[in-house]
């Protein structure tokens, strides 16, 4: 059974479950209406025939029954919400397999690609139809950004890559854990309002807003001096009342009470927003608790690597549940203000609100220290979850083997993960000490640019710790640098040719630096922005300069004169794509072959499209 079949089967099961829950929800809804109407009628009847006391008893009993039914109904409705979210998660999984971009979560349109990055724009790592969007299953903005940074790493680290690979392998086999983490994250996002809500319009939730809010709120003046001063006054007031009651002192307690109440009123601005602040903090963190509580209580005996990441949730005395209990007690204490009589009594006894607001300050300081660690672990898990989900959805992909002994890139059945399987042709390809620079020739639309992007995208996946679209891939660590989609810039006053020259100059400069990591370059149509004579001169000189350093890579070109460099420069070799014409149609097999391209097709394409072409 394929992954697609599995997901469709799971969706069918979830839809059957939704139908059952809807039936149950309907029954609870009917029961609530019946109980409400019956309660009102019975209370009225007993009031008229059995007395007010009996009517109140009946109303109370039916009210309790109504509350119990409402609680069960709420649980069913929550189950329906989670079931719907699970169906959505599974449908998005199918969309990732089938590359249905319109069904994938939206992207942050305010986040633009960096034109100066060594490969971001050229390889479609980010953007509307990008590798990042295909992989990204994070709910938080920070989790998504972490995944993005991994895919855009320009200085790969072998130890870090292998560590991520082990985590992704571990997570890949725990689909229930991954689904539940994503589900709870989604529930937290749609349930949270107030300071933790994202207002950006992106599909991601900006959880850092809560951290900023806590840090800003925690910067207020300490209440400790005020609490001590008011505590002394309240204690003095009680002592004066007791001594007056015992006829030991005159009646001075009203003056002390007025002084105490006046001081409390004078300092009230310090705690004016405490109740609303606590409500917002408690509500936000309770929704975080959906995720944190699951990570805190889960057993990690079978997932030791995962246990290391989730360690902040299991530290003794610093668990999220402990902070939740503290906030719960504070909420109950400060909630006294909703009862005017009780509030008056406790405030006469002591500076109730001031003391518990001071305690809120202390707890917020603890949370301000702990929350970033919890969030960091969550964001790390979300990024890893995205890679593991990608591995799960593509079981035929393999994890690359990293080698350090020599500079080498070798792949079997290498394909592009952003191409649909039915239109994808995979090729074997290798770069090593004997074949360091490949001159790639071929006709228009034959597959040259696609091969460059295929190599680059798979290296991006490999260095992020993800599996790659190949049956085998062995690679050293390289600094990837591309020159594929150069464009002019009206804002910067750059022509296309000058923009290309600047890009190629940056690439060449990268190869000349004294760096332990060599450059792997991917260049498409070198110097295409100038005339053929100068392009050929410039291309030959540039390739010679590249050959003098430790770098390696591919250069796709239409200039067949460049294939002669294979006979002139050691380490330069030729590969090509070709095409055939059948029944007046261009046919491409997209198979990579050694040697220079024996054919061209520009004139053929012009003739096929009805353009005039002179006889050669």
Which residues does each predicted region cover?
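ATPase nucleotide-binding head domains, primarily ABC-like/P-loop NTPase cores
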Residues: 69-70, 257, 266-267, 387, ...
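Alpha-helical coupling/stalk and coiled-coil linker elements that connect catalytic or binding modules
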Residues: 1-443, 450-480, 502-503, 513
């Amino acid at each position: 059974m394929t992954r697609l079949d599995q997901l469709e089967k799971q969706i069918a099961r979830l839809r059957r479950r939704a139908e059952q829950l809807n039936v149950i929800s309907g029954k609870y809804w009917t029961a609530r209406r019946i109980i409400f109407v019956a309660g009102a009628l019975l209370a009225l009847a007993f009031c008229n025939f059995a007395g007010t006391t009996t009517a109140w008893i009946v109303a109370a009993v039916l009210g309790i029954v109504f509350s119990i039914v409402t609680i069960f109904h709420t649980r069913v409705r929550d189950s329906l919400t989670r079931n719907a979210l699970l169906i959505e998660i599974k449908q998005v999984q199918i969309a990732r397999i089938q590359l249905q971009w319109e069904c994938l979560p939206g992207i942050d349109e305010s986040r633009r690609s960096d034109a100066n990055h060594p490969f971001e724009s050229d390889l479609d790592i980010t953007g509307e139809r990008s590798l990042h969007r295909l992989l990204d299953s994070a709910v938080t903005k920070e989790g998504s950004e972490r995944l993005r940074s991994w895919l855009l790493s320009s200085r790969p680290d072998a130890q870090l890559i292998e560590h991520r690979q082990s985590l992704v392998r571990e997570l890949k086999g725990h689909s229930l854990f991954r689904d539940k983490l994503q589900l709870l994250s989604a529930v937290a996002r749609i349930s949270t309002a107030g300071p933790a809500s994202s207002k950006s319009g992106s599909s991601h939730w900006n959880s850092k807003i809560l951290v900023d809010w806590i840090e800003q709120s925690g910067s207020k003046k300490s209440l400790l001096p005020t609490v001590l001063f008011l505590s002394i006054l309240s204690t003095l007031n009680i002592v004066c009342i007791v001594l007056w009651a015992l006829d030991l002192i005159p009646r001075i307690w009203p003056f002390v009470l007025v002084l105490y109440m006046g001081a409390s009123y004078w300092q009230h601005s310090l705690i004016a927003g405490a109740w609303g602040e606590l409500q917002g903090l408690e509500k936000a963190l309770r929704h975080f608790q959906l995720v944190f509580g699951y990570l805190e209580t889960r057993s990690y005996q079978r997932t030791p690597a995962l246990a290391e990441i989730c360690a902040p949730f299991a530290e003794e005395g610093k668990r999220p549940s402990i902070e939740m209990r503290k906030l719960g007690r504070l909420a109950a204490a400060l909630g006294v203000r909703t009862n005017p009589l009780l509030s008056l009594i406790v405030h006469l006894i002591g500076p109730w609100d001031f003391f518990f607001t001071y305690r809120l300050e202390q707890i917020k300081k603890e949370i301000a220290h702990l929350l970033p660690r919890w969030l960091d672990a969550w964001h790390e898990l979300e990024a890893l979850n995205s890679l593991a989900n990608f591995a799960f959805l593509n079981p035929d992909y393999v994890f690359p083997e990293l080698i350090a002994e020599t500079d080498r890139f070798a792949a079997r059945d290498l394909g592009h993960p952003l191409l649909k399987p039915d239109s994808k042709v995979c090729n074997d390809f290798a770069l090593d000490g004997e074949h360091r620079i490949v001159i790639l020739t071929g006709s228009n639309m034959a597959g040259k640019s696609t091969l460059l992007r295929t190599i680059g995208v798979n290296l991006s996946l490999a260095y992020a710790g993800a599996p790659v679209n190949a049956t085998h891939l062995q690679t050293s660590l390289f600094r990837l640098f591309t020159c594929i989609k150069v464009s002019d810039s009206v804002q910067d006053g750059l022509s296309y040719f000058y923009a290309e020259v600047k890009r190629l100059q940056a690439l060449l400069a990268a190869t000349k630096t004294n760096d332990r990591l060599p450059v792997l370059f991917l260049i498409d149509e070198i110097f295409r922005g100038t005339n053929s004579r100068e392009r050929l001169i410039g291309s030959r000189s540039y390739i010679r300069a590249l050959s003098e350093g430790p770098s390696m890579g591919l250069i796709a070109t239409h200039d067949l004169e460049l294939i002669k460099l294979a006979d002139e420069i050691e380490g330069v070799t030729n590969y090509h794509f070709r095409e055939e014409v059948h029944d007046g149609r261009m046919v491409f097999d997209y198979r990579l072959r050694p040697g220079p391209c024996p054919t061209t097709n520009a004139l053929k394409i012009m003739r096929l499209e009805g353009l005039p072409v002179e006889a050669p």
